[in-house]
């Protein structure tokens, strides 16, 4: 569960290392974001010469959460860190060209096939 002020790892090569959620998109008083939800983030820590710099405000899709996601068969997929992939604000396509770490199948349903195809492992 991601809410405002939550810090996440950037799971792509956009140049960001740490980002902070500043808004959960999709509803006027929506409190939590789960895997596959789009959030608004600000870059808190970035590498030099990256595509994004510290202070940039972008959209991001949540790809891993410590809370996890429950499957219809009753199993729960959990991760040890919260992570997201940064998106272009207008096209909602990934800023980076590589995805690091596994992502879940739930992204396939949420119109993020580009992220699923770039990911090294889909759980």
Curated annotation (Swiss-Prot):
SMART domains: Ribosomal_L14
Keyword ATP-binding appears in the UniProt entry: no
Cellular-component GO terms for this entry: cytosolic large ribosomal subunit
Cystine residue pairs: none
Matching Gene3D superfamilies: Ribosomal protein L14
GO biological process, one term: translation
Domain of life where this protein originates: Bacteria
Keyword presence, rRNA-binding: yes
InterPro entries: Ribosomal_uL14, Ribosomal_uL14_bac-type, Ribosomal_uL14_CS, Ribosomal_uL14_sf
Key words, A-Z: Ribonucleoprotein, Ribosomal protein, RNA-binding, rRNA-binding
A molecular function (GO) term: structural constituent of ribosome
Family: Belongs to the universal ribosomal protein uL14 family.
Assembly information from the UniProt record: Part of the 50S ribosomal subunit. Forms a cluster with proteins L3 and L19. In the 70S ribosome, L14 and L19 interact and together make contacts with the 16S rRNA in bridges B5 and B8.
General function of this protein: Binds to 23S rRNA. Forms part of two intersubunit bridges in the 70S ribosome.
Protein name: Large ribosomal subunit protein uL14
């Amino acid at each position: 569960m991601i809410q405002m002020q939550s810090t996440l790892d950037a799971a792509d090569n956009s140049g960001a290392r740490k980002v902070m959620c500043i808004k959960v998109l999709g509803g006027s008083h929506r409190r939590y974001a789960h895997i596959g939800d789009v959030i608004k983030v600000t870059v808190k820590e970035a590498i030099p010469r990256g595509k994004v710099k510290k202070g940039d405000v972008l959209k991001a899709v949540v790809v891993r959460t410590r809370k996890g996601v429950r499957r219809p068969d009753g199993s729960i997929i959990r991760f040890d860190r919260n992570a997201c992939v940064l998106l272009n604000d207008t096209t909602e396509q990934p800023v980076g060209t590589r995805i690091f770490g596994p992502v879940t199948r739930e992204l396939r349903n949420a119109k993020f096939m580009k992220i699923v195809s770039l990911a090294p492992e889909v759980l």
